[in-house]
């Protein structure tokens, strides 16, 4: 469907240019008690910091918006998909909640992508909880079949998990533990919890 979008309170309303009925997709529901069967997927913004295929670790300054090259990965690994963070969230390690977006083409640092989640990789690093959301672009019809982890090939999940388990291996003072996949419902609950941590810290 080719359409135009507009914000209406907490929703994005997409209207078909041909004039069919509008469909509202919720942007974010911070107090949601967990997904229920038949729910419209939660849509949220992810800011890309590192494009797919890069060994460069870029970080965006949340105050100035500047993109800084933090380092090149010490290992020979490369980011499997675009990697960034969910806006207005706070993870257990004190940073915004991390997200990996399954796009067919890389974007660029600072690009904002409306996403929906399909699962999450529970991890811990030297700073604490370091969970990684696995997302797709909300409007990508090619990925519409991806709704939960069961829809992703098992080998691809293993590749992604392996990357996050080893990409810090050669860096002094860095460590990674864990690496267990959880599904869509658990991931949405963590998004809401991260959003609440952020809002509680900015009252």
Region spans (language model):
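N-terminal hydrophobic alpha-helix used for membrane targeting or insertion
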Residues: 5-8, 76
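Hydrophobic N-terminal alpha-helices or hydrophobic patches in metabolic proteins across all domains
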Residues: 31-203
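Compositionally biased, low-complexity segments
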Residues: 7, 16-17, 25
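Cationic, low-complexity basic patches in intrinsically disordered or flexible, solvent-exposed regions
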Residues: 7-10, 28, 33
